[in-house]
Design a protein with these regions (language model features):
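Juxtamembrane interface helices immediately C-terminal to a transmembrane segment
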Residues: 25, 34-45
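N-terminal single-pass transmembrane signal-anchor helix
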Residues: 2-34
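Short, well-structured segments within or immediately adjacent to enzyme catalytic domains
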Residues: 40-236
């Protein structure tokens, strides 16, 4: 009677090592696929929000909403577009307003201080869980933070000279030099990539210029990028 030969220790070690090598090769690819899928969802969200803002404007003489609450001018546009998205006014958490990559730690002092102009500043995880960000990962380019410089609020679409460059709305993180899709330390860094939409309706995953000044005063939304960047915050 023939006896079945089992694996030797060396053979088992070779198999285990092979599995480990395969896992090491596959994990980065799986991670890239996950991040790509998250970015695709985010781009879809931003595209739908851009379309809803256009629908709102169509019903209001092609004029973008005027917002009197300057502290919330970037996020309170959500109430205006909800009816155009089949949502009810007053809804808070909604997947359409949540970037799946948005898991920022708002308790991190480096991030918390960026929102010092909000009272109270956000705490805990994610922008889309915060009342101060109107339960959204996204923001309307209505007005510069802590400033009287109007962006697209109250603008008539036809009056915009470069609609393919003027940001309409997109990821809130972009205004502060952060990126949910390409994390680095420190949190603010040059060319942080964000999903942004424009007045002409297109959506792009773009690099946001940062001047290197850390903290709230260095937020990219305070200044225009130099040549080489295909976006702008204002029309001067």
């Amino acid at each position: 009677m023939l006896m079945k030969r089992g694996f030797t220790l060396v053979e088992m070690l070779v198999v285990i090592a092979s599995i480990g090598i395969l896992a090491a090769l596959l994990l980065p690819a799986l991670s890239r696929a996950k991040h790509s899928a998250q970015r695709s969802v985010c781009q879809s969200n931003v595209r739908q929000l851009n379309f809803a803002v256009h629908m709102y404007a169509d019903d209001h003489g092609n004029e973008l909403r005027a917002i009197t609450n300057k502290e919330a001018i970037y996020v309170s546009y959500k109430e205006s577009v909800l009816p155009y998205l089949g949502r009810t006014r007053g809804q808070t958490n909604d997947a359409l307003f949540a970037c799946p990559a948005d898991d920022f730690d708002c308790d991190d002092p480096a991030i918390n201080t960026l929102f010092s102009f909000w009272s109270p500043p956000p705490t805990g995880k994610c922008f889309y869980r915060q009342a101060t960000t109107h339960f959204s990962s996204y923001a309307f380019n209505g007005e510069a933070p802590d400033s009287d410089t109007t962006r697209v609020a109250q603008k008539i679409f036809q009056s915009v000279r470069e609609p393919s460059k003027l940001i309409l709305e997109g990821e809130l993180s972009g205004a502060f030099g952060l990126s949910a899709h390409d994390r680095k330390q420190p949190h603010q860094f040059p060319d942080a990539r964000n999903v942004m939409s424009f007045v002409d309706g297109h959506v792009s995953y773009i690099k946001i210029y940062w001047n290197g000044v850390a903290g709230f005063d260095g937020c990219p939304a305070f200044y225009e990028p130099p040549a080489g960047y295909d976006y702008k915050w204002t029309e001067k």
